[in-house]
Amino acid sequence: MKISTEIDSIAKIVGMEKAVELCAKAGFDAWDFSLFDMCLIDWGTRLPLQRQHPLNGPHYLKFARELKKIGLDNGIVCNQSHAPFPVDAPAIRAFLKRAIECTAEAGGSICIIHPDNAKTAEENAEMYLELLPFAKEHGVKIATENMWNWDGEKDESSFAACATAEDFKKHLEVIDDEFFVACLDLGHAEMRGSGNGAVHMIKTLGHHLQALHIHENDRWHDNHQIPFSMDMDFDAIVKALKEIDYKGYFTLEACHFLDGYTEANVFEGVVKLRESATKLADMFENQ
């Protein structure tokens, strides 16, 4: 089982180029191309923030190629990417094809694009069907992901697109295309109030499940912490992945684990992330 991790949390400390290099040096097999800097928005107004980054400039493909080369020079590949979100913001929607382009240019085979939390499977299909021909031209699969909302009165998560196994599968079946697959966010699936558990979702999704966002939580909040640090049952989760013969990467999205790290010690944190991913991979291989 090959392992990967998102690079956004590392890049916030040392930049994207160095982040890819550190992933390789820590022992990951691959890197997950975080494309959020392509378009950052004000979550209140849904309007774009003015911020300069290679991903939102004219030479975005050149930047993607440079990251790919850094990875290859250090022995790792890009396995997948994460498009900017939320997709209900027009500014974000305008960059989704660019996200697919960058994924292909970096060598990734899957681009995770969130559904609109508030829309049905049929409504979200309109966006995905618009993007699929472009994705196919670039040899990139689109993966949708299980989401959540927050109920302030109950102080817990609440239903959103793909939050349950049944709604997730419906999103896939409405489109019914081999280039449209599932990325299961294990942490989201375990949040109280919205999902119905990672194990149930894994078994329901079956062969549709081709990508993962792996992180840890207290089974209440979306903590995005390092695996084995909180309350999730990874033994049961890995067993379920083995049962469906999961063939994708084990990709971490423990994006808050490095919050307290600095440029001086971030590599130590990346190594700890790699160690947690290796433990999960070993558990899978030894089932």
Residue spans for each PLM region:
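Short glycine-enriched, charge-decorated loop/helix-capping segments at active-site entrances
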Residues: 48-57, 157-158, 224-228
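Solvent-exposed loop/turn segments at secondary-structure junctions
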Residues: 10, 84-86, 117-119, 149-150, ...
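Histidine-acidic metal/acid-base catalytic patches
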Residues: 1-29, 36-40, 65, 72, ...
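Structural motif corresponding to the early beta-alpha repeats
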Residues: 28-126, 136-141, 247, 255-257
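Histidine/acidic residue-rich metal-binding segments in metalloenzymes
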Residues: 127-129, 133, 173
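Short glycine/proline- and charge-enriched loop/turn segments
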Residues: 46-52, 150-152, 220
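Active-site cleft segment of glycoside hydrolase catalytic domains centered on the general acid/base Glu
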Residues: 118-128, 154-161
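Aromatic-lined carbohydrate-recognition surfaces of secreted/lumenal glycan-active proteins
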Residues: 143-152, 184
